[in-house]
């Protein structure tokens, strides 16, 4: 026996079925009455050989109506913490969609690095991305990984700043949350003034930790706390 996600409105004693298929994921958007739905049904054959895609829609959890956002998304798709933006990947780039206007922006087009994990052995039509650390407070920016560093990029793509300096020494920097959020709680915003990083030297195999601190002109600085030889 399998169940579909639904919402029970206690004030009206109505139950709205949010899910329509077992081959989809439903993720409520915190602070709203909407949910992000990734529909896999049209691409089940491709998914069986590791080349899946999904159609992304917004479901209204009050009325049950659905609004299509993007078809055949071959990478990841998620909504920013405040529900303002859809973040998805396409063609080796990160894109945002303003959910109020439905305007889309390629936010990494002019960034002089690659966010694609070219060493992945994935058989999908598009190689996976290195991923993201998350969003900063109030959806001001999304923090995206390349092979070694973190980039702070605004949702309109107009500002892109590398906030670590790992490429020169081939040291991979990745954001880490020391105090994990409890079950069901949203992740804390990426803190570029007090947050922590894990470090790994891809050439030397050394590893350690570092910490962000506030720098000059709004640019954070990174200080190594631990940096150990391979054991």
Language-model features and meaning:
Residues 1-231:
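Beta-propeller folds
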């Amino acid at each position: 026996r399998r169940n579909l996600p639904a919402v029970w409105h206690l004030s009206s004693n109505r139950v709205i079925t949010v899910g329509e298929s077992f081959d989809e994921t439903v993720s409520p958007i915190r602070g709203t009455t909407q949910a992000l739905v990734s529909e896999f049904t049209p691409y089940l054959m491709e998914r069986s050989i590791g080349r899946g895609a999904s159609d992304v829609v917004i479901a209204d959890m009050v009325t049950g109506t659905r609004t299509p956002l993007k078809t055949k998304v071959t990478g990841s798709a998620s909504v920013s913490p405040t529900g303002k933006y859809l973040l998805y990947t396409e063609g080796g780039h990160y894109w945002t969609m303003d959910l109020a206007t439905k305007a889309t922006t390629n936010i990494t087009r002019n960034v002089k690095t690659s966010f694609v994990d070219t060493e992945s052995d994935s058989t999908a039509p598009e190689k996976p991305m290195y991923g993201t650390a998350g969003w900063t407070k109030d959806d001001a920016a999304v923090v995206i990984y390349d092979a070694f560093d973190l980039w702070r990029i605004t949702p309109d793509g107009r500002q892109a700043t590398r906030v670590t300096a790992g490429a020169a020494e081939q040291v991979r920097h990745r954001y880490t949350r020391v105090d994990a959020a409890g079950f069901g709680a949203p992740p804390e915003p990426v803190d570029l003034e007090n947050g922590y990083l894990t470090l790994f030297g891809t050439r030397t195999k050394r590893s350690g930790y570092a910490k962000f601190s506030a720098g000059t002109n709004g640019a954070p600085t990174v200080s190594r706390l631990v940096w150990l030889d391979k054991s």
